[in-house]
């Protein structure tokens, strides 16, 4: 049985329409900063709690800094405290490789000190520390530090770099690259879900651990991402702005999750470009500029 909780802040109820009437699915509409939702959650019998609730990304956190801290840290720790008292099997926190920030180390692993350059990164650092403190009190936890997300989904996000570049290339718009040398690891949304399932399937191995979730082969500079898209869509025009540089740059090792949980990703940036192309051709995305597809 699955219980889903969401505030539906982005008018995204349609993304669960296909499962809302399933007998083994229950939906709770609410914000994790609201005590009413906590009361509802506390009534449920829970084996595994997966905390995906967050104000995600640097721009979104910049627009709502107080809300970002409240959701990403305060409410997250409050939820974990509730789960500590419910004696669950596993609490999974969705974190981010953004905690590494601007880092000169060639390949970062889970032991590398975080150097976030944004509120989003800092809020996740604080959340991780809070979860680890509760772990010392008995909370069984796993933390997944996700690479940068991409991929077509029930509610595709076109404010994510790969998705945005794919959409722009497919609609004959320039790909604007700021600097372009900054490196990011990338992960498809389906592989993000897969990482969660691997933690649940291997609770004894996953418990008390932090995992970078992604694939070393998917560490790319932003310019490389643009060039991958141009390989698929040759008409793509890449515009580089050298005077605007993004300081966030890091390559990440994913050896731990591969070795400990036998986890490997299945999808690549090319899959996302092809999926977005197919969605546009099949008119599944009627208005790519709609606010439905953006968090900022």
Regions found by a protein language model. Give the residues of each.
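NAD(P)-dependent short-chain dehydrogenase/reductase
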Residues: 117-119, 129-184, 189-200, 227-232
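Conserved sequence/active-site signature of Rossmann-fold short-chain dehydrogenase/reductase
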Residues: 33, 99-100, 149-151, 192, ...
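N-terminal Rossmann-like NAD(P)+-binding domain of SDR-like oxidoreductases, especially those catalyzing
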Residues: 1-140, 145
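Nucleotide-sugar-dependent glycosyltransferase donor-binding/catalytic pocket residues
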Residues: 34, 69, 151-155, 185, ...
């Amino acid at each position: 049985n699955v219980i889903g909780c969401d505030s539906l802040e982005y008018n995204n109820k349609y993304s669960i329409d296909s499962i809302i009437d399933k007998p083994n699915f229950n939906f709770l509409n609410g914000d994790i900063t609201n005590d009413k939702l906590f009361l509802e959650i506390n009534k449920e019998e829970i084996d595994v709690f997966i905390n995906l609730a967050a104000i995600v990304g640097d721009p979104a956190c910049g627009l709502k800094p107080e809300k970002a801290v409240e959701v990403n840290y305060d409410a997250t720790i409050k939820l974990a405290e509730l789960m500590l008292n419910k004696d669950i099997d596993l609490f999974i926190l969705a974190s981010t490789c953004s905690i590494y920030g601007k880092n000169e180390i060639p390949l970062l692993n889970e032991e590398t000190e975080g150097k976030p350059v944004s509120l989003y990164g800092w809020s996740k650092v604080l959340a991780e520390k809070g979860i680890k403190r509760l772990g010392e009190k008995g909370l069984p936890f796993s933390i997944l530090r996700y690479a940068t997300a991409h991929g077509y989904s029930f509610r595709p996000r076109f404010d994510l770099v790969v998705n945005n570049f794919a959409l722009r290339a497919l609609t004959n718009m320039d790909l604007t690259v700021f600097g372009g040398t900054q490196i990011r690891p990338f992960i498809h949304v389906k592989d993000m879900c897969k990482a969660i399932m691997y933690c649940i399937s291997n609770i004894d191995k996953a418990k008390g651990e932090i995992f970078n979730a992604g694939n070393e082969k998917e560490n790319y500079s932003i310019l490389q991402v643009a060039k991958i898209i141009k390989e698929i869509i040759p008409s793509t025009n890449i515009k580089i702005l050298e005077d605007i540089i993004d300081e966030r740059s890091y390559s990440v090792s994913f050896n731990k999750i591969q070795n400990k949980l036998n986890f490997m990703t299945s999808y690549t940036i090319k899959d996302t470009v092809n999926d977005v192309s197919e969605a546009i051709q099949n008119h599944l995305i009627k208005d790519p500029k709609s606010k439905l597809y953006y968090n900022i």
